[in-house]
Structures are given as C-alpha cells and as structure tokens.
Swiss-Prot record:
Similarity comment: family membership: Belongs to the thioesterase PaaI family.
Keyword Transferase in record: no
Gene name tied to this protein: entH
Subunit structure: Homotetramer. Dimer of dimers. Interacts specifically with the aryl carrier protein (ArCP) domain of EntB.
Location in or out of the cell: Cytoplasm
Phylogenetic placement of the source organism: Bacteria, Pseudomonadati, Pseudomonadota, Gammaproteobacteria, Enterobacterales
Protein's recorded name: Proofreading thioesterase EntH
Superkingdom assignment: Bacteria
Pathway this chain belongs to: Siderophore biosynthesis; enterobactin biosynthesis
Principal location class: cytoplasm
Enzyme class: hydrolase
Gene Ontology cellular-component terms listed: cytosol
Function: Required for optimal enterobactin synthesis. Acts as a proofreading enzyme that prevents EntB misacylation by hydrolyzing the thioester bound existing between EntB and wrongly charged molecules.
Amino acid sequence: MIWKRHLTLDELNATSLNTMVAHLAIVYTRLGDDVLEAEMPVDARTHQPFGLLHGGASAALAETLGSMAGYLMTRDGQCVVGTELNATHHRAVSQGKVRGVCQPLHLGRQSQSWEIVIFDEQGRRCCTCRLGTAVMG
C-alpha cells in the first residue's frame, strides 16, 4: 500500500460534509493499494443545459479524487494544493452514475501527478484527467 495516511472510506466521506463535494453527491467507494475511487450521479446537479454530464462536474470529480489521493500521500503538517488540471472528454453521459479511478503517475517530495479516468456505468471511458499537485508544509 502506498498511502502514508490511513483513513477509512467513512472518514474520507466525512471530509466532504458542507462542501461542493457533498453538493455534487460525490462518494468515495474504494481505497485500494494504489487506487482511490469515487462515484458521482449524473442528474440535475451535474448536467449542463443540454442534459449531459457537465465537463466542469467531471473536472470536479477528478480534482476531488486527485487532491484526496495527494493528501493521503502526505505526512502530518503537510497538505497538497492543485497546480494543474487537464481533462479530455471522450464520451457523453446523460444519466446514471460515473466512477472515477485515481492512480499516481509521479510521487515526488514536492510535487505529485495523478491520472483520473472516469467511466460510465457500462465501464466505458468517458473522460481522462491529469492533476498536478504541490506538497505544502
């Protein structure tokens, strides 16, 4: 397991209370050896005006996952801040849920890079994101 902090899924989800993460109904669903996953509904909260998943909602899911994964890689007295987010949208989603899967690309002392892939309920890749974070403290 790569994580330096050891939190349960319940503890991870508790960090979302009264935040945009809760408003978008993003829920952490899996913490594996080197992977963090979350789900987000595709509904009125996350739609753009034409009834499809908003690209900004996908970006919010990606940044949520990458930032939390980055935090899990820090020690006491440290935190991470996002420095860059890139998202490539591959497929539209109009309903159901999407699942984000976050894995590290680079884990340095001062910077991290994360890949977040978003899948629809049929397991099709809908969006590929890369998040850069800086380690503070």
